[in-house]
């Protein structure tokens, strides 16, 4: 597993394939780079593909925080430059979707295109924000059941493969509590309309 270090944080990533434009896959909240493995395998047939574990996730270092979306963006921009990827297609899921959006806004010289897969909300409706705030408070208080319930009951369809649900739930619940709380606060603080307008 290759790593780079940015701002005293070791970041784990994987690279495969060749060809331009390169694709950078950006996972979601409390997930890791393995979530994009099928897509990485497919696009690596014709493109250079990079999948990374965002800071605080997977095999990357897990500093105390905070975890604003901009911190992930800075790490990804550094990775793009270090690997000399040129202008990339940034593909992000959930939290990774809004991270890809801000990457394009902050670093248009590094981004050829953006794909947002079921992104986190650009604007949280008040009732949703209230509910997510309560989940964050529960996580910080040591109660992980609301977090588990949120993942199991809001991130899947009723027809989802039960084994897949169990596997994803295991990975997401394994994320340290300080990461789960701080990363969600970063999502809530994201100014979607302002970033999208750029």
Give the ranges of each region predicted by the language model.
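Hydrophobic alpha-helical packing elements
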Residues: 39, 72-75, 180
């Amino acid at each position: 597993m290759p790593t780079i270090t940015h701002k005293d944080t070791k970041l784990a990533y994987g690279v495969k394939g060749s060809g331009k434009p390169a694709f950078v896959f950006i996972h979601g909240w409390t997930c890791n780079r393995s979530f994009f493995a099928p897509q990485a395998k497919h696009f690596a047939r014709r493109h250079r593909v990079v999948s990374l574990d965002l800071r605080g996730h997977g095999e990357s270092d897990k500093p105390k925080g905070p975890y604003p979306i901009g911190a992930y963006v800075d790490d990804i921009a550094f990775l793009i430059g270090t690997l000399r990827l040129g202008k990339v297609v940034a593909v992000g899921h959930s939290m990774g979707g809004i991270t890809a959006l801000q990457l394009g806004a902050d670093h248009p010289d590094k981004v050829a295109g953006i794909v947002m897969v079921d992104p986190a909300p650009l604007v949280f409706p008040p009732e949703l924000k209230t509910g997510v705030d309560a989940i964050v408070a529960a996580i910080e208080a040591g109660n992980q059941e609301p977090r588990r319930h949120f993942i199991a009951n809001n991130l899947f369809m009723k027809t989802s493969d039960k084994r897949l649900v169990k596997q994803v739930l295991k990975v997401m619940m394994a994320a340290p509590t300080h990461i789960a709380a701080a990363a969600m606060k970063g999502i809530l603080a994201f100014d979607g309309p302002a970033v999208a307008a750029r």
